[in-house]
Every structure is written in structure tokens, then in C-alpha cells.
Design a protein with these regions (language model features):
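Conserved alpha/beta-hydrolase "acid-adjacent" motif
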Residues: 173-179
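Short substrate-entry loop that stabilizes the transition state in hydrolases
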Residues: 2-4, 9-51, 120-121
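Short beta-strand/loop motif that positions the catalytic acidic residue
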Residues: 160, 166-168, 172
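Alpha/beta-hydrolase fold nucleophile elbow
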Residues: 79-91
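Alpha/beta-hydrolase active-site loop
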Residues: 57-77
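C-terminal catalytic histidine-bearing segment of alpha/beta-hydrolase fold enzymes
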Residues: 181, 185-225
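Mobile cap/lid helix-loop segments that gate and shape the active-site cleft of serine hydrolases
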Residues: 18-19, 116-156, 162
């Protein structure tokens, strides 16, 4: 039967050498598929079994891959998909990618951000350097402040037309929750459609916190798709 609304689930950073086909985001993909969504859960390039080299520093090549996937959906590559109803669900790095994609593709119906990276690429690179003990994120010094500004999704928020649903744990030790609160503040100041939720949880939700998160995601998707 169908056609079904489409949800593209974008995973966060996992060291590509350790990445497995069924990523930690798979339970969310399964949960949403069981509730009537056609869920696509791509593995970013360089993350097995996807080919190519993983992105270094800026993740815009992942956004290009997602945009190409969306084009395939709209061309009818998935007969059960409703190409007029597509939303994104991005965790951590995947949330950062989703922000870029949603600015380029205003045809999206909604974006769920879960413990998302920033739309400010300078902050992302600073955090990547911190996580990696300086082994990654050297682009922070190689790219000029102006290039980083132009590469940042937050530079273009005034042009955003896609509704956002933003979720972040107050105990997230990997991605600062303040990044999500700043995004929400900026979007509300611009009168953009956004809802924002904080949770007593970390970078990945568990138990009751996760249950409430899933309910809110379903409610948002039910409204926009």
C-alpha cells in the first residue's frame, strides 16, 4: 500500500573504521517505520558499506549526498514513497547536516534535531578538535573566518522556511545543549516555525526520557507530514 510519508534518518559521528551498517540510530528508524513512515537510513560516505572517503572537517559533502537521495525519492526511485511529504531526523553530526540540507531544500516538510551539532562551523571544528585531542578539526586553522561564516547554516537562518523540532539533553557531555538553545532563540527571533524541548538526559536518551522524546517526534511529524 502507500504512498507513505518519507523520513530520512541521519546518523551522528561514529569513527568510520568502527561504523556498522545497523548504526545506533537504527532503533529510531525502526520505531518510525512501524508507525507508517517510509524510513531511509543512509550511511554517510566512507561509513561501510557506503563507498568513498569520509568528510574531513566540514560535513557539506554529506549534505550533498542527502540532497542527491532526496532527488532520487522525488524522481520515483521508491514507488511506495510520497515525494511531496519528506522530513529529516538528524542526531548529532546528522543534525548539523540536516540544517544545511533544509536551507538548500525548502520542499522539506520538517526537521527533527536531536542533540544536534551547531550551525556555526567554527564551533563545530573547535569541538571536534577537543574531542579528538587535536587529531581532527585542523580545518579550524586552515580556513578563514569568512569561509567558515559562509559555510555555516546559521548565517542563512533568515531564509529558512522548514519547521524545526529541536531536542537536547541538559546533561549532554558531547554536544553543548546551549547550541540548541541558541538556535531556538535565533529562530524564534526570526519568527520561524520551531518547537524546542530540553530533557534530563545525555547525548542519547534512555528509558522514560526517550519515550517522551519519541512521542513528541511523532506528534511533530503527524502535524507536518
Amino acid at each position: 500500500t502507500g504512498p507513505f510519508p518519507v523520513l530520512v534518518v541521519l546518523h551522528g559521528y561514529v569513527e568510520p573504521g568502527r561504523y556498522r551498517l545497523l548504526a545506533y540510530t537504527t532503533p529510531y528508524a525502526d520505531f518510525l517505520a512501524e508507525r507508517g513512515y517510509l524510513v531511509l537510513h543512509p550511511n554517510f560516505r566512507g561509513h561501510p558499506p557506503s563507498e568513498g572517503a569520509p568528510a574531513q572537517g566540514l560535513r557539506h559533502v554529506y549534505a550533498v549526498d542527502v540532497l542527491n537521495l532526496l532527488a532520487e525519492v522525488r524522481r520515483g526511485a521508491f514507488p511506495q514513497a510520497d515525494p511531496a511529504r519528506i522530513a529529516l531526523f538528524g542526531h548529532s553530526m546528522g543534525g548539523g547536516v540536516a540544517q544545511i540540507v533544509s536551507l538548500v531544500d525548502p520542499g522539506l516538510k520538517g526537521v527533527v534535531l536531536y542533540g544536534s551539532m551547531s550551525g556555526d562551523e567554527r564551533r563545530n571544528l573547535e569541538r571536534i578538535r577537543y574531542w579528538s585531542g587535536g587529531s581532527r578539526g585542523q580545518e579550524l586553522f586552515a580556513l578563514s573566518p569568512e569561509v567558515l561564516r559562509q559555510a555555516s547554516a546559521w548565517t542563512y537562518l533568515a531564509e529558512l522556511s522548514v519547521p524545526y523540532s529541536v531536542h537536547h539533553g541538559t546533561q549532554d557531555a558531547q554536544v553543548p545543549p546551549e547550541w540548541s538553545w541558541e538556535l531556538c532563540h535565533r529562530l524564534k527571533a526570526l519568527k520561524k516555525p520551531v518547537e524546542c524541548f530540553s530533557y534530563p538526559g545525555g547525548h542519547l536518551f534512555r528509558g522514560e526520557v526517550d519515550r517522551v522524546f519519541r512521542e513528541r517526534v511523532l506528534a511533530f511529524l503527524g502535524r507536518v507530514l
